[in-house]
A protein has these predicted regions:
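Catalytic cores of nucleic-acid editing and processing enzymes
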Residues: 1-283
């Protein structure tokens, strides 16, 4: 998920010297806002701008187009069929991808990459930012409950014309689904740039009413792995790739800001502390 880029030269200074920050004093009309959110801990809104990260997004588009796979290490595109990009043009449709330029402790630049949600049933793919939870634990807690839900569905189908029995079964199935979602949300661990960790519930500040998919978008994945890897994000960009979504609100090759419907409520916490890290860069 981390790619080293050449040491900065020219206007950023020779290799080995701390680069000039492009972030100090940035105003909203200077750069496109990549992601933003209100931190419920400090009470402030935090923002990360594009800051030129779109060029890395365009490079990733070229790779996806030429490789036809999320395996970008040089293997043949048919080496891992589940990673093939033609999947994005079928019934599942396309998805968002993200890139983030970061500064490493040694002064080098790193590029992180992420895809939203799962890719063809996979949460983790080499070279891409991982989810905010342990996917093995997710599989473990999901298996048993999903089996119960499936069994209730079969009982519901067999209930036939018994309305009272059907009502009870539907209520039980709904309760099981809600309990499973709470357990899944309980697996998420968010880290910010103060080095503080929080659960999804604490970061959202909204109890158990958390929209499905919160924390699975590109921005949370990228911010989380950057914070945990002691990297300082300099800029981020997200784009859509594949067949347009059913509503037509996403088109291939176009850049979009981070998800406001699901992830804005946690991005404030995740971005908290980044301004101080940027100030350290400026010196």
């Amino acid at each position: 998920m981390i790619i080293r880029t050449p040491e900065p030269t020219g206007e950023n200074g020779p290799a080995g010297q701390r680069p000039r920050s492009t972030l100090a004093g940035v105003r909203p009309d200077d750069h496109t806002v990549a992601c933003r959110g209100l931190c419920r801990v400090c009470g402030r809104e935090h923002v990360l701008y594009d800051n030129g990260a779109r060029r890395y997004g365009l490079e990733l588009m070229d790779l996806l187009r030429s490789r036809r796979s999320l395996d970008l290490r040089g293997a043949a595109p048919d080496h891992q069929p589940r990673l093939s990009t033609p999947w994005l043009y079928r019934e599942a449709r396309g998805k968002m991808f993200g890139v983030m330029e970061c500064l490493a402790p040694d002064g080098s630049r790193r590029i992180l990459r992420a895809f939203s949600g799962q890719y063809n049933g996979l949460w983790e793919i080499d070279g891409w930012a991982p989810p905010l939870f342990d996917s093995r634990k997710l599989t473990a807690i999901s298996a048993a409950t999903e089996a119960e839900i499936k069994e209730l569905g079969m009982e519901l189908a067999a209930a036939g014309g018994d309305p009272e029995r059907s009502r009870i079964l539907r209520r039980c199935r709904r309760r099981l689904s809600q309990d499973l979602m709470r357990q899944i949300h309980g697996l998420y661990r968010l880290t910010n740039f103060h080095g503080r960790e929080a659960s999804l519930f604490a970061a959202c500040g909204c109890g158990s009413a958390i929209p499905t998919g919160t924390g699975d978008c590109c921005a949370p994945k990228l911010l989380n792995i950057a914070a945990r890897s002691n990297l300082v994000p300099l800029g981020m960009a997200e784009f859509f790739w594949g067949r347009s979504n059913r509503s037509g609100s996403r088109e291939e090759g176009r850049f979009y800001p981070s998800c406001a419907e699901k992830c804005a409520m946690i991005l404030g916490f995740m971005l908290c502390g980044l301004e101080a890290r940027h100030a350290d860069i400026v010196g």
